[in-house]
Regions:
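Short amphipathic alpha-helical segments
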Residues: 9, 52-54, 562
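Secretory pathway export signals and precursors
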Residues: 11, 15-16, 107, 126, ...
Length: 591
């Protein structure tokens, strides 16, 4: 790690003395590793959100060899000889081509909002990028350095794998893309036919499936495994025992039939395995990281498959907390928040997002070697708050963290939940935490006077844990630090012409009487629409980043913003043309 200090010192030579003092007193910022791979030399490449760098370490993680800065947050990487393809995103999603020889970015290819998960196609002639917020996957020609084909999926693609014959790509949709006031709400895996680069199918997973994160394909190409959360939204949030609210699972997809087969729970009857993240497999093992309980599961693959295939009623499998009994070892890791990992030979290389501790696990002995990659690492209150928000150790039996219902940087899971704070049998749609501290009251029914109160009540009544006040204040600080992602509906950061017309419709319909001010809310209760449960009505939510928080209305009955206006006539008491509805939708989705 002396290399890092050496690089930092040399980079500061031209800085002002005051700048040097400021950095020295601040200590080393967290890495917040977004991706990690080994290159052909066996070196460890890591993209870091916290520093906006691509770092190259020795294989053991003890020596920093090179560090390359980027202008936006690096989200994923793909090494190829003397080049590294790096996806970046803050305002503009791009695939950046870094020359390791010169240390310069040779090209920055626009791909789409939320660029992540770069990967080569089976023939290595093209690179494929998931655009999380553009809801698309693009094909990039690395020679011409431009996007040559694009296909839309459902909602927030974040990972993908190819079938062994290369004919199909299977893509995760992070969240459900549907209305929430129905019996079955679940995210899907989209299937892309590669010849025509078209979506041919959406495979819906088990009821409650959300936060789809990792994917892998079995060596024989028969099955694809998808790691995800499994929300039990059909029951009140009255307890946690035996996964009453949230469980963690991996779904099994039959590749040839392109069908969901069943979901395997990775929790135990009296011990949750929250924060399920990445998944990998070979003939002998399945490996899964649990970012909330800070461990890795090592599953006997042949024994699991034999038991799975002989399981008579697979529709009941996603409630079987004993399924993996005797088939899995839970290996505790050092640090906090294992997410992405590398499976190489006989070892797993696992960074920890909230600690910068590198764990190396021998898959034969399950012995763990830990390396501190960032000595002198310091955390701000906001950093600590994000860590607590994602840590299932602050929950009874480790079943969930705040991330369980608010995945994707404290946003929404797209489902309805029957919280106990306003009665029973009246489910409400999950809200994003963005700007919650500056737009009181909290909850759509306004039952919490402030987000500060809601944070403490959430730990107590949802995670059945009593937080210390210092911890709660850090979570407040984290939530206050959240900032909106620029809307993918914007054009070069500005309203499109259609959205400008929609702004006029917004003003004509007097939407601003309730959705006013910098956050587009008057922070008051209004009786509007049908099925008004409470005398005072509903709290007025912010419209900032509303493009990201579907479904809409208090119970998620509107799958899209267009349905809010066209079907449910929200706030509309006069005839409005189809053209005006489309323009209004464009404007609101641009906020």
């Amino acid at each position: 790690m002396n290399t890092r200090k050496y690089l930092i010192k040399n980079s500061l030579v031209a800085c002002l003395v005051g700048c040097c003092v400021s950095l020295a007193s601040a200590g080393n910022p967290p890495f917040f590793t977004t991706d990690a791979v080994l290159n052909a030399k066996g070196e460890l490449l890591m993209t870091q959100k916290g520093t906006r760098h691509l770092d190259i370490f020795s294989a053991d993680g003890k020596s920093l060899l090179h560090s390359f800065p980027f202008d936006e947050i690096p989200t994923g990487l793909l090494p190829d000889g003397d080049k590294v393809y790096v996806t970046t995103f803050e305002k503009t999603g791009r695939l950046q081509v870094l020359s390791l020889e010169s240390g310069r970015v040779e090209s920055a290819i626009p791909t789409g909002s939320g660029a992540c998960h770069p990967m080569f196609g089976p023939d290595k002639k093209h690179i494929y990028v998931c655009n999380q917020f553009d809801n698309s996957v693009v094909e990039v020609d690395p020679v011409m350095r431009k996007v040559v084909r694009s296909v839309k999926v459902l909602r927030e693609p974040k990972s993908a794998v190819f079938s062994k014959d290369g004919k199909y790509m299977f893509v995760t949709n992070f969240l459900p893309s549907q209305r929430a006031d129905v019996d079955v709400v679940a995210a899907c895996v989209s299937v892309i036919e590669m010849d025509g680069f078209t979506k041919v199918k959406d495979i819906q997973l088990a009821n409650g499936s959300n936060a789809l994160r990792g994917m892998c394909i079995t060596p024989d190409g028969k099955y694809i495994y998808v790691s995800h959360n499994l929300g039990r939204f059909t029951v009140p949030t009255s307890q946690l025992q035996q996964g009453w609210m949230n469980t963690s699972a991996f779904s099994v997809i039959d590749v040839a039939k392109q069908e969901f087969v069943g979901a395997v729970l990775v929790d135990e009857p009296d011990r949750g395995a929250a924060g399920i993240w990445s998944i990998a497999c070979d003939d002998k093992h399945i490996f899964i990281t649990h970012s909330g309980t800070h461990e890795v599961s090592v599953i006997d693959h042949p024994a699991m498959l034999a038991k799975f295939e002989s399981y008579k009623d697979k529709s009941r499998l996603d409630y079987d907390l004993n399924f993996l009994y005797g088939l899995r070892e839970r290996v505790p890791l050092q640090g906090n928040g294992p997410r992405n990992f590398i499976f190489s030979g006989d070892k797993l290389i696992i960074p920890t997002y909230f600690a910068d501790i590198l764990n190396t696990v021998d898959i034969n002995t399950l012995e763990v070697t830990a390396t501190d990659m960032n000595p002198g690492r310091t955390e701000t209150p906001e950093n600590k708050g994000e860590k607590y928000f994602n840590d299932a150790n602050h929950c009874y039996q480790g079943w969930q963290s705040c991330n369980g219902c608010h995945p994707g940087d404290a946003r929404t899971d797209g489902m309805n939940w029957d919280l106990m704070n306003d009665g029973v049998g009246n489910s409400k749609n999950c809200k994003s935490m963005l700007y919650s501290h500056v737009t009181p009251p909290s909850m759509i029914s306004g039952v919490r006077e402030s987000a500060e109160y809601a944070v403490r009540a959430g730990f107590k009544f949802i995670q059945f844990f009593e937080p210390e006040e210092e911890m709660a204040k850090c979570v407040d600080a984290y939530m206050k630090s959240l900032r909106p992602v620029p809307s993918p509906y914007l054009v070069n950061g500005e309203l499109a012409d259609k959205a400008k017309e929609g702004r006029k419709v917004f003003e004509k319909l007097k939407c601003g009487e309730c959705h006013s001010g910098p956050y587009y809310t008057d922070m008051k209760m209004h009786r509007i629409g049908e099925d008004i449960e409470f005398e005072k009505g509903w709290d007025t939510p912010t419209l900032i980043e509303v493009w990201r928080t579907a479904p809409y209305l208090f119970d998620g009955r509107a799958a899209t913003m267009e349905e809010v206006f066209e079907v449910h006539k929200h706030g509309i008491d006069k005839k409005v043309s189809k053209k005006d509805v489309e323009a209004l939708t464009e404007y609101v989705n641009s906020l």
